[in-house]
Amino acid sequence: MASISTPFPISLHPKTVRSKPLKFRVLTRPIKASGSETPDLTVATRTGSKDLPIRNIPGNYGLPIVGPIKDRWDYFYDQGAEEFFKSRIRKYNSTVYRVNMPPGAFIAENPQVVALLDGKSFPVLFDVDKVEKKDLFTGTYMPSTELTGGYRILSYLDPSEPKHEKLKNLLFFLLKSSRNRIFPEFQATYSELFDSLEKELSLKGKADFGGSSDGTAFNFLARAFYGTNPADTKLKADAPGLITKWVLFNLHPLLSIGLPRVIEEPLIHTFSLPPALVKSDYQRLYEFFLESAGEILVEADKLGISREEATHNLLFATCFNTWGGMKILFPNMVKRIGRAGHQVHNRLAEEIRSVIKSNGGELTMGAIEKMELTKSVVYECLRFEPPVTAQYGRAKKDLVIESHDAAFKVKAGEMLYGYQPLATRDPKIFDRADEFVPERFVGEEGEKLLRHVLWSNGPETETPTVGNKQCAGKDFVVLVARLFVIEIFRRYDSFDIEVGTSPLGSSVNFSSLRKASF
């Protein structure tokens, strides 16, 4: 398939890591098993050269209905996601095992998966030669297409499907066409955000980052991608509320919203919520994108995509993928950097301000590339707490999948699942894997670890193409995350936070913001 180069003029990745030019998104090539006893199988992943013993996949699915419900209760209520997986790793002495994934009965037809919970087995989920991605974006169930205008959106398409290439190229065009607006619009919108947070902090003694940030993120995306200020349209400031409600209707089987189990289980985990309840909200969003995306819709015409289908895909990519990702990522970044302490804050502030000063007071892509600690901190945030925790793929053929300690036979048609935080905090790959280490990716040795940063549905050292499922906006997300850190430490020497929980990401309040003193 054809590929397209990154829409950004300067690579976001160290040159020492990649020898080939940027394309976009990850592909791992199939390696044939050399053992004569398994000539019909493909080795899904292989690191090192030692022969690993073939082991039966441990675990079980329990009784129909009862087993999936028990696993769902463990996942949401009795253990929580991380302990759910870790306890079974201890039980089976294996990072590969069989388990049921939510939502199970009665929303998902088949909740049974083979879980891949280490950094060696996990990457098979990116290899579209080995796994199919059709209708697996949300896992073992797919929300009704009534929530997306009757269309299967790009995120649910396998690269083998004809529309995948056209729709992904449309997103590449969107990114390319917006590149000159990203820097000025980010600085304008996030300067307004921090001005308002300072006022709130002075009045109340603390400032809620999440609520204010949601509106800022949408304003930035609308202005950067489409050249439209939502305040000047019928949408006004309503987008975050409309999107949050719509996302809830898409993802409610996978969320816990803090209600008692006896209420939450029948309400959001047992049956799908009726799409009709958000139809009018979605229509308001659709009309905004239809009216704002003129240049992009002209490109859709050229690609042979109807304007209606293109608009639904632009809405999903902007609101679900990008805004939703920023809603999770930015509060998590504030949390992790806040907890790193004032010494780290001072180092970031010194690096950012000195680089900008030496660049004549101007922030450019070239200047950002010189901010080694800033870049490392962003990658560490993405490693430690990836905004997307789950990846799914259905085996296209019989496979042998290797963990660090054993190899496992998987049959064609079996569902594979990976919980990304365990893969990117694999202690056999990362030293101090469960610690946030700001300088982890600084220097040549640090750069070599970037291939194990997997948040984008592929290694950080790879790039998206129309032939894979790596996030089309991977480089965009890394860029805006860097801009976010830069904006904070251009303005402040340090800050303090209070952290709570949220169904999507973290709830963060600023308890202090110390303005720049040098």
From Swiss-Prot:
Heme b binds at K133, H164, K168, K469, C471. Its EC number is 4.2.1.92. This is Allene oxide synthase, chloroplastic. One of its GO terms (molecular function) is oxygen binding. The keyword Amino-acid biosynthesis does not apply. Belongs to the cytochrome P450 family. Keywords: Chloroplast, Fatty acid biosynthesis, Fatty acid metabolism, Heme, Iron, Lipid biosynthesis, Lipid metabolism, Lyase, Metal-binding, Oxylipin biosynthesis, Plastid, Transit peptide. It catalyses: (13S)-hydroperoxy-(9Z,11E,15Z)-octadecatrienoate = (9Z,13S,15Z)-12,13-epoxyoctadeca-9,11,15-trienoate + H2O; (13S)-hydroperoxy-(9Z,11E)-octadecadienoate = (9Z,13S)-12,13-epoxyoctadeca-9,11-dienoate + H2O. Cytochrome P450 enzyme involved in the biosynthesis of oxylipin jasmonates, important phytohormones acting as growth regulators and signaling molecules for plant defense. Functions as an allene oxide synthase that converts hydroperoxy fatty acids to unstable allene epoxides. Catalyzes the dehydration of 13-HPOTE ((13S)-hydroperoxy-(9Z,11E,15Z)-octadecatrienoate), as well as 13-HPODE ((13S)-hydroperoxy-(9Z,11E)-octadecadienoate). The lineage of its organism: Eukaryota, Viridiplantae, Streptophyta, Embryophyta, Tracheophyta. GO terms for cellular component: chloroplast; chloroplast envelope; chloroplast thylakoid; chloroplast thylakoid membrane; mitochondrion; plastid; plastoglobule; thylakoid. The gene is CYP74A. Coiled coil: none annotated. One of its GO terms (biological process) is defense response to fungus. It is an enzyme of class 4 (lyase). Pfam families: p450. Disulfide bonds: none annotated. Its cofactor is heme b. It comes from Arabidopsis thaliana. (13S)-hydroperoxy-(9Z,11E,15Z)-octadecatrienoate binds at N321, T389. Gene3D superfamilies: Cytochrome P450.
